[in-house]
């Protein structure tokens, strides 16, 4: 979740117009204070915001959230050689291997999204993604032969999940899984759940630009989240007030390679093995981060028309897209955007 609108949304959430201070609930005689904490996890900065009755409760909430994210990073990271994700690539070839519930949840969701998008979203693209990761360091587009060889070790059909047994099986040696297009959203929602389990009603977790948030802050109808900064009259407000949901944004503004007259995104199209070159930013709003994070990546690969068709066929998410062509900027929204956003507004308390 990772682009122009992503940075705008992240900044807006972290610098909410709600000042730190005491907030008295209508239904009680105790006060809530806003507390914030930042730690590095999953290769980025994670910020947690909570409203609690005191510092001790806030510290417990922060620790629960950050610890949950750290535990998930140890499972889902493709950068850590000893992560569970990387370990199964070597032992699950041809043999079903039982995995943790967290890893299974992410891989099952990824497999389902791959089916729904005919492979536009594909976590088996690890070998290809690693070539593009190296390309961003060397500032050179990957060699065609190297891309072709890497792609021969990919394909979502080669990834099998068994819900009853909680197992994963791979069809081919040399495969590498990369869940970067879905993991941060899952981690944000899981950290939020850990905080909520402590009795904290209003909290927000921001992992880079993957945002998950619970009940509205005191005295408001939602967390203020900026979704675009386009000038002029727009059908969509530039700031939304949302509660009990998640927001994820994908784009090429932060991670990209400028080469051969093109800007190649870190998001790779499995059908071409190339980084995306369209200037498209996708923001997805959903009830949970797992859904939002996966869909923004899938829609980026599918493009505007097919991406909107994908999300319009679902009931659990909506999307806002910004497409830039030269000096022209176009703002597009999925068909149920307004009604879905309205449903995520919480009553002021």
Regions found by a protein language model. Name each.
Residues 2-349:
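Mature catalytic core of soluble alpha/beta enzymes
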């Amino acid at each position: 979740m990772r682009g122009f609108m992503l940075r705008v949304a992240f900044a807006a959430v972290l610098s909410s117009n709600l000042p730190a201070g005491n907030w008295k609930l209508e239904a009680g005689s105790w006060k809530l204070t806003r507390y914030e904490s930042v730690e590095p996890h999953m290769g980025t900065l994670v910020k947690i915001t909570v409203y609690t009755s005191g510092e001790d409760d806030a510290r417990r909430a922060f620790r629960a959230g950050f610890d949950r994210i750290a535990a998930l990073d140890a499972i889902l990271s493709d950068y850590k050689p000893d992560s569970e994700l990387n370990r199964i690539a070597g032992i699950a070839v041809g043999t079903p291997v039982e995995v943790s519930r967290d890893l299974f949840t992410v891989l099952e969701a990824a497999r389902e999204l791959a089916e729904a998008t005919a492979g536009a979203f594909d976590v088996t693209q690890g070998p290809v993604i690693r070539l593009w990761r190296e390309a961003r360091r060397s500032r050179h587009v990957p060699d065609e032969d190297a891309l072709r060889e890497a792609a021969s070790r990919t394909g979502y059909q080669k990834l099998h999940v068994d819900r009853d047994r909680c197992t994963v099986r791979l069809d081919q040696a040399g495969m590498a899984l990369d869940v970067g297009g879905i993991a941060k959203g899952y981690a944000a929602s899981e950290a939020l759940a850990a905080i909520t389990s402590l009795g904290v009603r209003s909290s927000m977790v921001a992992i880079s630009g993957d945002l998950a948030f619970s009940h509205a802050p005191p005295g408001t109808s939602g967390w203020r989240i900026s979704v675009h900064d386009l000038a002029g009259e727009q059908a969509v407000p530039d700031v939304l007030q949302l509660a009990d949901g998640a927001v994820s944004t994908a784009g090429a503004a932060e991670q990209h390679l400028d080469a051969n007259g093109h800007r190649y995104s870190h998001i790779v199209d499995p059908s071409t093995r190339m980084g995306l070159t369209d200037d498209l930013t996708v923001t997805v709003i959903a009830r949970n981060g797992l859904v939002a994070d996966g869909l923004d990546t899938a829609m980026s690969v599918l493009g505007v028309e097919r991406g909107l068709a994908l999300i319009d066929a679902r009931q659990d998410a909506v999307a806002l897209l910004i497409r830039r062509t030269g000096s022209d900027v176009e703002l597009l929204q999925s068909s149920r955007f307004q009604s879905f956003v309205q449903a995520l507004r919480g009553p002021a308390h």
